[in-house]
Every structure is written in C-alpha cells, then in structure tokens.
C-alpha cells in the first residue's frame, strides 16, 4: 500500500452530495446515518481513494480486489443511493444550470447516457485491459498510464451501473424489466470467464506473482463481481414479484356454488 489518492472530482461530488443531503434532510431528525449506511459509505470511499503498488507480488491480491471494487461494488453502492438529484440540490445555481444544459435534448452526453450498449462496451474493454499480463506489467512501469486507466475504469463503471440499476433521472425512458435484467447479465459471462481463467490457472501468468496469489485474486474477483451482477439482475425481478404479491385478489362473482370458489 503506497498511500491515498484522493481525486479532486470525487471529492467535489462527495461535497455536493453532502451539501444537498443536508439541505433535503428533514430538520430535527435524529442521527445523521445508521451504522449500515456509514459502513457502505466508507467502503465506497475506500475503493476510490486506495492507492496500491501493483508490481509487488504481495499486493497482487489487493490490487485485483480494488479493481473489483472499482468495477462492481463501489459504483453499485453509489447508484443505489440515487445521488443524482441530491448532488443537483447541493450544487450552486449556476453549476446546476450548466449541468442542465449539458443534459439537454441535443447533448452528446445525454445521447451516451441513453445507450447501455455503448456504456457496457466501454466498461468491459477497460475492465479486461490490464488482465493481459503484458499490459499489466506495462501499466506497472508507467504510473501515469496506470492512474489514467484507474480513472477510466471507475467512470465507465459508473456509467455502466447507471444503466444496470436504472439510476437515471426522469428524462431517461424507463426500461422494461427484461432490459433491466439483461444489462447486468450481459456482463456476467465475460466476468466469469476472467475469474475461471485466473482461479484454475496451473502456471503463473503475471511476472513476479506466485500461482497461489493469482488463484486467490481470481477467486475473490470472480465472487465479488459475480455476486454484484447477479444481485443487480435479480433486483428488478424481486421488485416485480413483490408488486404482484401486493395486488388485491380478484373478487369472485356472487352466486357461484361453493365447489367452484
């Protein structure tokens, strides 16, 4: 572990979220947050701020674990809190109007935010990039390139999970349940293939990394990403089943014989 890399964009967004949350929070309420929410917030901050040295064999497991947190756990937790409207409430009026203009009907940013396929391709491409042993070693020798890749992975993951969890504001058309299930499931086979390849490897694929460390890292990455993607796919199905269960029972016509009821 080499220290903490607190990126300015994440700090700014966290500050706007805190300001908006305090503005929207009912006055006179008790605690600011319970233990569960505080733990999830700490875990999300840890994923975005933790800096590791990937060239050491002892840090290989922790490095891939951070990749999994950046790609799956942290953005999923981030969007589960529905922060879009809260951040807008925390932003100054001038910045709020500028963001609204960027998300206008003819904005390229709005077009990208409406297409889950482009977000998924960008996310999976950046996620798979350093799993190549040659590229992994090259990134370890070039800290600037490695930092740029980390930022690209984190932002592409945020955009991917924007679609997977349907965290967009009202101007984005609401997808059906089937589309909300397909988006996370489409990434599951690719992620599973990576996890299986690392977990069942018989020889070291990365320089200065023992097979045991490679297998442990692959298993952790496989389980972390697989559970998060499966949860995202089952979430809309569980909500649909819950809505069906809460529907009132159909009233039977009067006058039917008891045997037909």
Where are the model-predicted features located?
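Alpha-helical membrane segments of multi-pass proteins
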Residues: 1-261
């Amino acid at each position: 572990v080499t220290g903490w890399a607190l990126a300015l964009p994440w700090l700014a967004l966290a500050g706007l979220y805190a300001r908006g949350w305090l503005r929207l929070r009912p006055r006179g309420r008790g605690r600011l947050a319970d233990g569960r929410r505080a733990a999830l917030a700490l875990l999300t901050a840890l994923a975005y701020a933790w800096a590791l040295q990937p060239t050491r064999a002892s840090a290989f497991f922790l490095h891939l674990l951070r990749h999994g947190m950046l790609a799956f756990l942290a953005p999923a937790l981030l969007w589960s809190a529905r922060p879009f409207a809260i951040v807008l409430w925390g932003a100054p009026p001038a910045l709020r109007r500028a963001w609204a203009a960027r998300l206008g009907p003819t904005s390229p940013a709005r077009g990208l935010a409406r297409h889950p396929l482009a977000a998924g391709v960008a996310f999976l491409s950046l996620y798979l990039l350093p799993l190549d042993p040659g590229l992994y070693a090259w990134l370890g020798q070039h800290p600037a390139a490695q930092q740029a890749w980390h930022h690209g992975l984190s932002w592409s993951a945020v955009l991917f999970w924007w679609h997977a969890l349907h965290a967009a504001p009202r101007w984005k058309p609401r997808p059906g349940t089937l589309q909300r299930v397909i988006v996370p499931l489409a990434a599951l086979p690719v992620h599973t293939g990576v996890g299986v390849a690392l977990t069942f490897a018989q020889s070291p694929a990365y320089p200065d990394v023992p097979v045991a460390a490679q297998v442990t890292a692959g298993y952790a990455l496989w389980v972390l990403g697989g559970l998060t993607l499966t949860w995202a796919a089952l979430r809309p199905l569980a909500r649909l089943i819950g809505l069906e269960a809460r529907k009132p029972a159909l009233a039977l016509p009067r006058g039917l014989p008891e045997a037909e009821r």
